[in-house]
């Protein structure tokens, strides 16, 4: 059972750097118009029949029968090769949490700068999702975002080091997803996803 860390009270801000938040952000920054978090494989396959790209993982590894894993690098390749506009996502931890919420913002290292700007002045609850490998990389983003929301300068290099050296990052490298880790800490997008009524779209 994963125990979330929460800082503050207000609209949830979900941080799952490796990798759900990063996959969602990458999708919306690269032509996907909506992302649907799903609870089960069965639900994901229903969306596949409706023309959705389906992405997902269980304990880091791609779910059998899905188009891609929970991988921003695989997602970019799929978008380049196809004409996908909608994505359904199933992950071990984050999508379960997202499915339980009516509203939420989604943040990662990929959009830390824009999130600190757009969420400043709002009442929010910063939630580090974590995994069975811990939540150090998510905690780093939560703490950095909290600083940014309070007007302090964010130390992006410190955040990057926490993510790269986390147990979750080492696990991903060990199962062949090191390119995702490298992408996530070296890319920046100007998009802030928001979940409303089960659908995630870009927030303006």
What are these regions (language model features)?
Residues 1-6, 20-29, 38-84, 95:
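Residues that scaffold, gate, or flank divalent-cation-dependent active/transport sites
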Residues 8-10, 32-33, 49-52, 82-85, ...:
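Short coil/turn connectors at secondary-structure junctions
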Residues 12-15:
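Short hydrophobic beta-strand that contains or immediately precedes a catalytic carboxylate
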Residues 28-31, 120, 142-144:
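Short, solvent-exposed amphipathic alpha-helical segments in soluble enzyme
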Residues 58, 91-92, 107-109, 128-130:
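Short, structured patches in soluble enzyme cores that scaffold and shape functional sites
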Residues 61, 65-104, 137-204:
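Long, charged alpha-helical interface segments
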Residues 115-119:
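A short, acidic, amphipathic alpha-helical segment used as a generic capping/interface helix at domain edges
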Residues 134:
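Double-stranded RNA-binding/processing signature
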């Amino acid at each position: 059972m994963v125990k979330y860390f929460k800082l503050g009270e207000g609209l949830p801000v979900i941080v799952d750097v490796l990798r759900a938040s990063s996959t969602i952000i990458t999708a919306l920054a690269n032509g996907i118009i909506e992302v649907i978090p799903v609870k089960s494989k069965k639900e994901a396959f229903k969306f596949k029949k409706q023309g959705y790209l389906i992405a997902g993982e269980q304990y880091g590894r791609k779910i059998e029968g899905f188009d891609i894993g929970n991988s921003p690098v695989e997602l970019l390749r799929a978008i380049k090769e196809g004409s996908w506009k909608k994505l359904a996502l199933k992950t071990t931890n984050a999508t379960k949490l997202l499915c339980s919420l009516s509203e939420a913002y989604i943040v990662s290292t990929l959009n830390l700068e824009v999130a600190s700007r757009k969420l400043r002045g709002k009442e929010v609850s910063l939630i580090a999702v974590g995994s069975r490998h811990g939540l150090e990389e998510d905690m780093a983003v939560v703490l950095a975002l909290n600083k940014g929301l309070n007007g302090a300068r964010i130390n992006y290099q410190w955040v990057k080091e926490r993510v790269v050296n986390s147990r979750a990052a080492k696990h991903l490298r060990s199962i062949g997803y090191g390119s995702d880790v490298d992408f996530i800490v070296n890319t920046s997008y100007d998009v802030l996803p928001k979940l409303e009524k089960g659908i995630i779209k870009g927030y303006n």
